Regions:
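Preference for long, amphipathic alpha-helical scaffolds in soluble/luminal domains
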Residues: 1-188
Length: 188
């Protein structure tokens, strides 16, 4: 599902979603169903392999939710992924995939944008599971990005990472200002 990394099922599905392949594509829908049948971790998210069978990756869950929602996966089949994501919100309002691996205490723009895209696509598809919780988390995550003025440290005012100013495609899991601006224009 996730290896080899850049040509894996996961990133292929993300690319197809970002290219706006028709959302009723049956082959893609069947592939997503197979992922859901074979790759759920103990925490309800998507496992990448044996090392993530207990704790899934927050970034991957956000990206998976994005394309699974876009391709009209059954809402009920995504409840555990929503629950898993909502359990990972950090005190500063965003998300960080390293919380389950190395105990990160500050949110990451990379992870936060992936989760925001997933939650927004879930709602855009008309799904209503945990609607109020999702709205609250989206608000705090957007505030987290805006607090950083898209790319600046909230502590020092310096550029967090110069790569945030490079406009790349496909972005995969990486954050940049174009991806953030695209998110804001897409979600209104």
């Amino acid at each position: 599902f996730y290896q080899p990394k850049w040509i894996s099922t996961h990133y292929t599905l993300l690319d197809l979603r970002n290219l706006n392949l028709p959302s009723n594509n049956e082959i893609v829908q069947e592939t997503i169903e197979l992922v859901l049948q074979n790759n759920l971790a103990d925490d309800g998210g998507i496992q990448l392999g044996p090392s993530t069978s207990e704790h899934s990756d927050v970034c991957v869950n956000g990206m998976f939710l994005n394309y699974a929602s876009y391709f009209k996966t059954s809402e009920k089949k995504m409840h555990s992924i929503i629950d898993c994501l909502l359990n990972e919100i950090m005190a500063d309002g965003g998300f960080n995939c390293r919380t389950t691996r190395s105990g990160a205490t500050h949110s990451s723009l990379h992870t936060t944008i992936s989760v925001l895209e997933g939650l927004s696509e879930f709602q855009k598809a008309g799904y209503t599971y945990r609607k109020d919780d999702i709205l609250s988390v989206k608000k705090s995550s957007i505030e987290f990005i805006l607090l950083h003025q898209l790319f600046l440290s909230d502590r020092t005012g310096q550029i967090i990472n110069k790569d945030f100013l490079k406009l790349t495609y496909p972005c995969r899991w990486k954050y940049d200002i174009l991806r953030a601006l695209d998110f804001f224009q897409y979600t209104g």
